[in-house]
C-alpha cells in the first residue's frame, strides 16, 4: 500500500499501543509456567501474533478474552509441532523461540520471513552449540534438535543484539543446572536485558547480575503462573512524540515514565532540543518550540534513530546521532534509509560507520521508500504530515508493531490518502 500525506498540523490526544517487547516476553514466560497465566492488555500486532502462533504450534493453549482485553495461557503443555513454525518478520520471536525450543525434547523448525532472513543469528547459534544443542540455519529455516540442557556456562558477545542474551535468559530456568551467562563485551541495549529480568521476576524467577551486566546467573527453578500487565510502548510512541515537537501540542497516554524501556529517553532528547515536555502518571505532553541541534548517543535506544532523525531535520544546527551502527541490521539498513529519506526531503545528511550527522533545515515533501520497515514508515509519516506532498511506499508495514498508526495520525488531523 502506498499512502500520500498532505500538509497538516496534527495535534490532540492519543493512547499508544501496548509494548511489543513486554508482550512477547510475557507470552514466552507464561508458556513455560505450570498452570494458567493471563496477559493483560497485550499488543495484537504482527510480531506478537507471530510469537503467539509459534507457541500455539508447540501445544500451548492461548485464548483471547476480548471483554477483559487479555490473553489466557495454560503453560508447559509443549508437544512436538506438526509442521514448521512461522516467525513472520519477528526477530524476537525467532531468537527467543530458538532458545526455548532448544530445551524441548524434539525437533523444531522455525521459518523466517523475507527480511528476517537477513538478520544475524550466528551469535545465538554459537551460544547454543556451547550448551550442546544441535541447531543450524538452512535458508530461511532454523532447525533445532532440542533436549535436556546439562551444561551451565555460556559466553557470547553483548554488543551485537541484546535479544541473544534475553533468549538465553528466558530458557535458563528450565536448564538442569540453570545458566551462567558471560558477555565478552559490554551489552548494547542494556535496558532490554533489564526488561527481560523484570519479566522473569514477574513469573517468580530469580536472576542475578553483575553491576556491569556482563555476568548473569539464573539458577534452575520453575516459572510460576502470573497475571502480567503489559505497559505502553515507548518505541511506538516515538514518532508521535517527535510530531508533538515539530507540529502541534500532543498529549499521549499509556506511557509509564518510570519504565525500564530504553526509548523513554526520547522525551529527554526532545527537552534538550527545546521542545516543551510535560509528564504525569501514565502520560506525556509534548509541545513545539524552536528546536536546536542535539548530540545523542543511541547505543541503548537504537530504535529511536528514525524518530529522532526527523526531529533533528527540523532543528537549527548540526545534530550528531551516535551509537547507531547496529541500526544497519534492523528490518532495513536504517542508517541508509533515514539518510536517503531526509536527503530526498532536502536535508543534508552524512553517514558514518557509527554516526549520522544531520544539518537541520526546512524539509520538503518527497517520495519515501519505507523499505518495508515499520519505524521508517512511521517516522517519515509523522514528518510527511507536516511537510505535505509526501508519499510513502509499503505503508502497511506498520502492522508489525502499530497496526492502526495511520488511523491514529488521521484522528489527530493528519491528511492521509491511502492507495494512491
Curated annotation (Swiss-Prot):
Reaction equations catalysed: 3-phosphoshikimate + phosphoenolpyruvate = 5-O-(1-carboxyvinyl)-3-phosphoshikimate + phosphate
Biological processes, Gene Ontology terms: amino acid biosynthetic process; aromatic amino acid family biosynthetic process; chorismate biosynthetic process
Active site: 303
PANTHER family, sorted: AROM/DEHYDROQUINATE SYNTHASE (PTHR21090), PENTAFUNCTIONAL AROM POLYPEPTIDE (PTHR21090:SF5)
Record's keyword terms, sorted: Amino-acid biosynthesis, Aromatic amino acid biosynthesis, Cytoplasm, Transferase
EC code(s) of this entry: 2.5.1.19
Xref: HAMAP family: EPSP_synth
The protein's name: 3-phosphoshikimate 1-carboxyvinyltransferase
Gene field: aroA
Family membership: Belongs to the EPSP synthase family.
Enzyme class: transferase
Organism the protein comes from: Dehalococcoides mccartyi (strain ATCC BAA-2266 / KCTC 15142 / 195)
Transmembrane regions listed in the UniProt entry: none
NCBIfam families listed in its UniProt record: aroA (TIGR01356)
Keyword NAD in record: no
Known role: Catalyzes the transfer of the enolpyruvyl moiety of phosphoenolpyruvate (PEP) to the 5-hydroxyl of shikimate-3-phosphate (S3P) to produce enolpyruvyl shikimate-3-phosphate and inorganic phosphate.
Subunit (UniProt): Monomer.
Amino acid at each position: 500500500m502506498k499512502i500520500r500525506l498532505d500538509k497538516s498540523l496534527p495535534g490532540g490526544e492519543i493512547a499508544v499501543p501496548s509494548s511489543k517487547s513486554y508482550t512477547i516476553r510475557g507470552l514466552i514466560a507464561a508458556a513455560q509456567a505450570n498452570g494458567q497465566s493471563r496477559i493483560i492488555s497485550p499488543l495484537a500486532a504482527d510480531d506478537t501474533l507471530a510469537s503467539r502462533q509459534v507457541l500455539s504450534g508447540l501445544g500451548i493453549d492461548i485464548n483471547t478474552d476480548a471483554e477483559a482485553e487479555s490473553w489466557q495461557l495454560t503453560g508447559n503443555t509443549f508437544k512436538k509441532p506438526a509442521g514448521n513454525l512461522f516467525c513472520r518478520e519477528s526477530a524476537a520471536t525467532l531468537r527467543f523461540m530458538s532458545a526455548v525450543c532448544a530445551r524441548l525434547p524434539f525437533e523444531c523448525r522455525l521459518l523466517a520471513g523475507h527480511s528476517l532472513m537477513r538478520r544475524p543469528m550466528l551469535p545465538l547459534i554459537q551460544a547454543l552449540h556451547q550448551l550442546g544443542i544441535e541447531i543450524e540455519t538452512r535458508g530461511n529455516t532454523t532447525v533445532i534438535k532440542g533436549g535436556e540442557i546439562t551444561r551451565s556456562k555460556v559466553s557470547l558477545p553483548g554488543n551485537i543484539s541484546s535479544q541473544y542474551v534475553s533468549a538465553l535468559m528466558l530458557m535458563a530456568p528450565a536448564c538442569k543446572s540453570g545458566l551462567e551467562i558471560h558477555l565478552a563485551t559490554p551489552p548494547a541495549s542494556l535496558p532490554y536485558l533489564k526488561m527481560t529480568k523484570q519479566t522473569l521476576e514477574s513469573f517468580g524467577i530469580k536472576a542475578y547480575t553483575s553491576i556491569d551486566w556482563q555476568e548473569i546467573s539464573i539458577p534452575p527453578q520453575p516459572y510460576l503462573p502470573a497475571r502480567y500487565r503489559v505497559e505502553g510502548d515507548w518505541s511506538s510512541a516515538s514518532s508521535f512524540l517527535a510530531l508533538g515537537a515539530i507540529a502541534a501540542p500532543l498529549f499521549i497516554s499509556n506511557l509509564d515514565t518510570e519504565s525500564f524501556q530504553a526509548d523513554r529517553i526520547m522525551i529527554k532528547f526532545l527537552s534538550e532540543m527545546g521542545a516543551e515536555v510535560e509528564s504525569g502518571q501514565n502520560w506525556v505532553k509534548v509541545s513545539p518550540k524552536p528546536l536546536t541541534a542535539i548530540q545523542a548517543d543511541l547505543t541503548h535506544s537504537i530504535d529511536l534513530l528514525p524518530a529522532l532523525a526527523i526531529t533533528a531535520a527540523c532543528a537549527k544546527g548540526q545534530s550528531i546521532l551516535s551509537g547507531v551502527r547496529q541500526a544497519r541490521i534492523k528490518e532495513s539498513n536504517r542508517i541508509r534509509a533515514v539518510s536517503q529519506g531526509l536527503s530526498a526531503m532536502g536535508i543534508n545528511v552524512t553517514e558514518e560507520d557509527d554516526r549520522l550527522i544531520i544539518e537541520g533545515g526546512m524539509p520538503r515533501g518527497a517520495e519515501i521508500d519505507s523499505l518495508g520497515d515499520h519505524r521508517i514508515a512511521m517516522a517519515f509519516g509523522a514528518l510527511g504530515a507536516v511537510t505535505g506532498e509526501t508519499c510513502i511506499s509499503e505503508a502497511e508495514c506498520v502492522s508489525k508493531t502499530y497496526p492502526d498508526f495511520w488511523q491514529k495520525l488521521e484522528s489527530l488531523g493528519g491528511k492521509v490518502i491511502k492507495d494512491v
